[in-house]
């Protein structure tokens, strides 16, 4: 397992090669096996390939265009270019998995304290599911990219998905072999208390 963790990379270039339904099913099943707070399993995974992927990418493009004019995310303008680049990656990848929080509070309202705690727990649970999926993709010889730039089209994508979008995952055969990214030094990341 440690070797898979060490070898996982964020892939931003994909080959024009199909990914089998069996491979995607295995990745999705790994996500479903993730631990979750109070075993709530807040996730719903929506796989988009082919025409559905093209349609949802068009939805994201419309959301990014709207964000430029009428921002949903305050002060988002400096990051729009990154979201547009991510959209091109999504168009290139053969499969996109969208992760929806089935028990989320709406992004449009201020959460109560209970809802805020629940959202923190749900975010941790969904993060564990996504990590399981990225590691399984790596183990299967596939590349993946954990995508959060979908928030620039949060309203549009959540409507298309019929649920509160949390993140997305691009999946495909890597057309690049990036080096490991720098990590914090152990002494800056780990504190021992005994």
Language-model segments: what does each one mean?
Residues 1-18, 22-26:
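Short acidic N-proximal helix/loop "leader" segments that mark the beginning
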Residues 3-11, 165-194:
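C-terminal helix-cap and adjacent tail motif
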Residues 27, 31, 97, 103, ...:
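Small-aliphatic-rich amphipathic alpha-helix that forms the alpha element of a beta-alpha
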Residues 35-39, 170:
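Glycine-rich phosphate/pyrophosphate-binding beta-alpha loops
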Residues 37-38, 89-91, 139, 160-162, ...:
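Solvent-exposed alpha-helices and their adjacent loops that cap or buttress functional pockets
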Residues 46-126:
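Glycine/small-residue-rich phosphate/adenosyl-binding loop
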Residues 63-64, 98, 154-172:
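Short, conserved aromatic-histidine micro-motifs
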Residues 93-95, 140, 165-167:
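Generic beta-strand structural signal
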């Amino acid at each position: 397992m440690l070797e898979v963790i060490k070898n996982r990379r964020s892939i931003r270039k994909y080959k024009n090669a199909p990914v089998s339904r069996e491979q995607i099913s295995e990745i999705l099943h790994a996500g479903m096996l993730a631990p979750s707070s109070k075993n709530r399993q807040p996730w719903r995974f929506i796989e988009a390939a082919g025409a559905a992927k093209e349609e949802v990418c068009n939805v994201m493009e419309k959301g990014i265009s709207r964000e430029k004019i009428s921002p949903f995310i305050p002060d988002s303008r400096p990051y729009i270019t990154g979201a547009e680049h991510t959209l091109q990656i999504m168009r290139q990848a053969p499969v996109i998995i969208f992760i929806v929080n089935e028990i989320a509070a709406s992004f449009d309202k201020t959460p109560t304290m209970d809802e805020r705690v629940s959202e923190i727990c749900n975010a941790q649970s969904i993060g564990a599911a996504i990590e399981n999926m990225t590691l399984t993709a790596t183990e299967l010889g596939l590349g993946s990219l954990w995508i959060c730039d979908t928030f620039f089209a949060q309203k549009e994508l959540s409507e298309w998905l019929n649920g509160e979008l949390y993140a997305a995952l691009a999946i495909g055969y890597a057309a690049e072999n990036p080096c490991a990214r720098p990590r914090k030094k152990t002494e800056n990341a780990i504190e021992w208390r005994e």
